[in-house]
Amino acid sequence: MVDAAVLAKLEEGYAKLAASDSKSLLKKYLTKEVFDNLKNKVTPTFKSTLLDVIQSGLENHDSGVGIYAPDAEAYTVFADLFDPIIEDYHGGFKKTDKHPASNFGDVSTFGNVDPTNEYVISTRVRCGRSMQGYPFNPCLTEAQYKEMESKVSSTLSGLEGELKGKFYPLTGMEKAVQQQLIDDHFLFKEGDRFLQAANACRFWPSGRGIYHNDAKTFLVWCNEEDHLRIISMQQGGDLGQIYKRLVTAVNEIEKRVPFSHDDRLGFLTFCPTNLGTTIRASVHIKVPKLASNKAKLEEVAAKYNLQVRGTRGEHTEAEGGVYDISNKRRMGLTEFEAVKEMYDGITELIKLEKSL
């Protein structure tokens, strides 16, 4: 049963959202009918309610999406809301569709997107993973956070070769270490208001940590937005090298930590925008000519399913004509195909910038 106080909060939040001019996918798909159908449902294991799913979007009317999954079962229990949002965001991934089996393809296919080193400042490929047997952020206890951190820390300490490095827990971190990680742009902060409203930041900084290799080209975030964010990056445009490093790491970690996977949705994550491959392949790129013609930039981006963000990521501006550009689609295609969309799109953008 859903608590009366929760229901009251839902009704009030829904009324405000319905009356707002919010452009979020939540507002678009949370019709009165869907709302009434879901407001009394709870997930079987962790007893998550519709409020847990939508409260970030209820509080932040400027959300792009506005919903999160408090636990894996939420994707099924609240499917009437998740499915249309997933379909809208992931370019027509319908509720009858099934995400393909994981396939990283031939890692030697990709070369350098910018061999002359004129446009691409840095390249990064990341994926998200959830550990089997644990819910997502809002349902985790402090003990679970700590237990997960120790599992992750011991798993990563077994990595060798290029991936060998050190794990830094956020709890009790020395000031000098903290400053170094900030300078390297590695340190994640307590979540923004979108994550705060989704209850993704409880017991902070318990159970949170950062691992990086000695060369600072491989990074793992433990219990930021997802249980694990696995990141490979470096200066320049050598996507091939960066992708290969990521794939090696994911395969190594998966041998030791079982990941949550769903036959239909692929790898499960806290935010529905990251489902499926969970892959986000991005570049920081200077395209001053295209930057002065934003419409053209957006047009090419749309054609190749690319997402254009400001220099410092979501909800930021482009500084000095530098954009963060990545693949937008993560579902209904393989990991290899997701990275290839970005590779082809960036290649095209550079060609266009040169011709202007």
Curated annotation (Swiss-Prot):
The keyword Transcription regulation does not apply. Substrate binds at G64, V65, G66, I67, Y68, E225, C271, E314. Residues 119-356 form the Phosphagen kinase C-terminal domain. GO terms for cellular component: cytoplasm; cytosol; extracellular region; extracellular space; mitochondrion; plasma membrane. GO terms for molecular function: arginine kinase activity; ATP binding; creatine kinase activity; kinase activity. Pfam families: ATP-gua_Ptrans, ATP-gua_PtransN. ATP binds at residues 122-126, 185, 229, 280-284, 309-314. SUPFAM superfamilies: Glutamine synthetase/guanido kinase, Guanido kinase N-terminal domain. Residues 6-91 form the Phosphagen kinase N-terminal domain. Keywords: ATP-binding, Kinase, Nucleotide-binding, Transferase. GO terms for biological process: phosphocreatine biosynthetic process; phosphorylation. Its EC number is 2.7.3.3. It catalyses: L-arginine + ATP = N(omega)-phospho-L-arginine + ADP + H(+). Belongs to the ATP:guanido phosphotransferase family. This is Arginine kinase 1. It comes from Drosophila melanogaster (Fruit fly). The lineage of its organism: Eukaryota, Metazoa, Ecdysozoa, Arthropoda, Hexapoda.
